[in-house]
Amino acid sequence: MNIIDELSWRGLINQSTDLEALREEASTPITLYCGFDPTGPSLHAGHLVPLLMLRRFQQAGHNPIVLAGGATGMIGDPRDVGERTMNSADTVSDWAERISGQLSRFVDFDGEHAARLVNNAEWTNEMSVVTFLRDVGKHFSLNTMLARDTVKRRLESDGISYTEFSYMLLQANDYVELNKRFGCTLQVGGGDQWGNIVSGVDLNRRVNGTSVHAVTVPLVTDSDGKKFGKSTGGGSLWLDPEMTSPYAWYQYFINASDADVIRYLRWFTFLTQEELAELEVEVAERPFKREAQRRLAREMTNLVHGTEATEAVELAAQALFGRAELRDLDEKTLAASVSETAVAEIKAGEPRTIIDLLVASGLADSKGAAKRAVKEGGAYVNNERIESDDWEPFAEDLLHGSWLVLRRGKKNFAGVQILG
């Protein structure tokens, strides 16, 4: 199957230049690229669809280039509201290096169609202002640039600086450089990048006399129109395990709605049409089993964190519900799993009966409610039912020397860390 047909049935083509011409060109190996500006210390879930596009093309026998925006990251693509914070050169350079280190999970840098990593600071930082204005700026119509939706919205509100206004030119020039240096003839990117990408297509025609292509992927939202990739705490869902734990990552995907899960499986995984059709039947006929959600969470955690982390996360989920031993969890996984709910810290000398712990952890809003939970048999510590109001933990009850997992009823969890 031609890679363009593969992308089409997955619903991954949002906008494109001449798709038939690209399909014909992609019948033999092409070179393509996607750029990522280091606007933070890690890639996040929103980067995955365009990044995985590179992997899909590579698996189909094409040659991907990953561009780290060491120069464009100093400027920032204009957003709908307000100027971006200008980060220091050292910060952007550090972030670019950290992001570069995450890429090997997604594209292969060895073999016949090895991916290439480039940084646009290499050519942008060497360009003088006069050269930029003469060789790049003269090819852009101010009318066209002002017609861009984001620019229009900014001009109607708080305005836009020349710095951000010129971002489009820098990105377009990247495409020209990659075409000159490596014969790159396709840029892929997010749907919000269409204006920048087609500017690069046009600049290649004017400067290099070449016909190149552009494809954007859909912006990922859930069925309610909410932005994809925000964690339960409201922050970004980072690919760095130190910023978003594998447990939190897994939980995000296992909680996908029935309305979203098949679309996410098409866009984020490499499952076949046949496998996806079977899971679609599961969602329609047996949604309570959440088989598609489990498959999505497993595939995504394997992809980003590896199979060992996935196994640890799934063991943690089972242990919280009493289907595996909490003591079998390593401390990092245990802490991450309970931190998704609430964690109470109990210092030396503070009362620590089961009643105190239930109130401190937020599982009971009063001592009276805590006592009722114990009396009704609904209070658990480390999956053991507590039957006495005056129960206190002994040293041997503490997981990894300091942790307790509290549960009220079947599904309400909290962590307690004993500090002294």
Curated annotation (Swiss-Prot):
ATP binds at K230. A motif ('HIGH' region) lies at residues 38-47. It is an enzyme of class 6 (ligase). One of its GO terms (cellular component) is cytosol. InterPro entries: aa-tRNA-synth_I_CS, aa-tRNA-synth_Ic, Rossmann-like_a/b/a_fold, S4_RNA-bd_sf, SYY-like_C, Tyr-tRNA-ligase, Tyr-tRNA-ligase_bac-type, Tyr-tRNA-ligase_bac_1. It is found in: Cytoplasm. Coiled coil: none annotated. The keyword DNA repair does not apply. Residues 352-418 form the S4 RNA-binding domain. L-tyrosine binds at Y33, Y167, Q171. A motif ('KMSKS' region) lies at residues 227-231. The keyword Transcription regulation does not apply. GO terms for molecular function: ATP binding; RNA binding; tyrosine-tRNA ligase activity. Keywords: Aminoacyl-tRNA synthetase, ATP-binding, Cytoplasm, Ligase, Nucleotide-binding, Protein biosynthesis, RNA-binding. GO terms for biological process: tyrosyl-tRNA aminoacylation. Its main location: cytoplasm. Its EC number is 6.1.1.1. It catalyses: tRNA(Tyr) + L-tyrosine + ATP = L-tyrosyl-tRNA(Tyr) + AMP + diphosphate + H(+). Catalyzes the attachment of tyrosine to tRNA(Tyr) in a two-step reaction: tyrosine is first activated by ATP to form Tyr-AMP and then transferred to the acceptor end of tRNA(Tyr). Belongs to the class-I aminoacyl-tRNA synthetase family. TyrS type 1 subfamily. This is Tyrosine--tRNA ligase. It comes from Corynebacterium glutamicum (strain ATCC 13032 / DSM 20300 / JCM 1318 / BCRC 11384 / CCUG 27702 / LMG 3730 / NBRC 12168 / NCIMB 10025 / NRRL B-2784 / 534).
